[in-house]
Amino acid sequence: MASILEYLPGIPRSYWRDYVKAIEPTKPLVIPAGQRKVQLFPSDLTDKRGIVLQFAMNSNNPGITFYVVIDNRRIFANFTQLNDAGYTGYYIRDMPWLSEYNTTGNIYVVNLNTEIPFNNDVYAYVDNTTTSDAVIGSMGFHAIIFNKGFYKALADLKNGKE
């Protein structure tokens, strides 16, 4: 199955406004040195009707690990690292929620290729295993939640319907 992200650049922006909710921290986060589990987003921000498609983080610190917990199940502890110049296959530059990214550091992406319904909570965590505190800027980490309607709209678009 192809990644859902491969289709995003061709989707009219009205679909994004109607079906996509982007969440981001409002202030920089300081992650203390040592292995910690720091919750980045409170669970009440998640759309219970929806699914989690992607988490992205801009960081050049290899000692920082990001992971997601859905319904108490830890998933995707190993993020895919995209190099700064390429963004190959993900069309990062075409995604409006990443529009303020520059080319410093690395972009880490968790790509969930299939719909993952959830009944309870979704958490994004950070472990900092380095000996220094890490600061994540307020534009650094985004949670993008697509509701079920987005997938119907996407299917219609792929089938030639507007």
Task: Enumerate the language-model features and the residues they cover.
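Beta-strand-centric surfaces of beta-sandwich/beta-rich domains
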Residues: 2-162
